[in-house]
């Protein structure tokens, strides 16, 4: 009994022992970090606004990198074979972990759609994808995100990936390092504020890029996604 009373006294004298973690939601763009909750007392706490970090990977010194503008293109393969890509692409996209072609061993097709503006087809595309139970990636711009909220909400609700096509759809090699980051992260923040999700795939506007812009966007945690077929 004396031991029990002694333990109770120690517990009362040390109410802060063990500490308490705040219920924080730390968001590192473009990928979301899990929320870790550890409650000690049943009290209400306010959740701080998620923070936006401009970079999640060490930056490369871009002053040593080429900023020659490269326009992405492909050449159709014969007999339904996979396409080939321009020999003058002086910077191989895969050097910076960009995606443009996957192995055809499993005969998988990845569908991506650029949503720079709405021409009346997206609702039909979403209907067809839903009917066939197929998921796709839709790359949206800032104006599209603002004007086509119903369609973007459908993309999110129906399980599609919404990718970053930058906020103003500018040729990235013409921008400074800071402007490139702003074009990408401003759109990411708007999307996160509206839907609670972060973007992780980027399609450079007009398919124009340079070694410098690939490096910058990779440092932001993005995967650049090009294409091997267009319609």
For every predicted segment, state its role.
Residues 1-22:
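Sec-dependent N-terminal signal peptides of Gram-positive bacterial secreted proteins and lipoproteins
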Residues 114, 129, 162-165, 202, ...:
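Conserved, mostly hydrophobic/aromatic
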Residues 125-133, 145-165, 217-219:
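Acidic (Asp/Glu)-rich catalytic clusters
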Residues 106-109, 132-136, 158-160, 197-200, ...:
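Short, well-ordered coil/turn segments that N-cap beta-strands
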Residues 116-120, 140-148, 171-175, 203-209:
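Acidic-and-aromatic substrate-binding clefts and catalytic sites of carbohydrate-active enzymes
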């Amino acid at each position: 009994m004396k031991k029990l009373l002694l333990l109770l006294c120690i517990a009362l004298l040390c109410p802060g022992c063990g500490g308490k973690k705040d219920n924080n939601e730390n968001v590192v763009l473009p990928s979301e970090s899990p929320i870790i909750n550890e409650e000690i007392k049943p009290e209400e706490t306010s959740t701080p606004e998620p923070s936006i970090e401009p970079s999640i990977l060490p930056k490369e010194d871009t002053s040593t990198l080429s900023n020659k503008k490269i326009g992405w293109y492909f050449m159709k393969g014969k007999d339904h074979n996979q396409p080939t890509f321009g020999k003058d692409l002086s910077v191989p996209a895969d050097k910076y972990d960009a995606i443009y072609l996957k192995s055809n061993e499993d005969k998988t097709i990845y569908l991506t759609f650029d949503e720079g503006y709405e021409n009346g087809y997206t609702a039909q595309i979403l209907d067809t994808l839903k009917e066939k139970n197929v998921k796709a990636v839709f790359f949206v711009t800032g104006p599209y995100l603002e004007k086509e909220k119903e369609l973007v909400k459908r993309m999110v609700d129906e399980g599609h990936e919404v990718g970053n096509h930058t906020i103003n759809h500018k040729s990235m090699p013409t921008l400074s390092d800071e402007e490139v980051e702003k074009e990408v992260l401003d759109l990411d923040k708007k999307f996160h504020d509206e839907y609670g999700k972060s973007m992780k795939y980027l399609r450079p506007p007009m398919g124009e890029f340079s070694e410098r812009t690939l490096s910058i966007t990779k440092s932001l945690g993005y995967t650049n996604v090009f294409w091997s077929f267009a319609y």
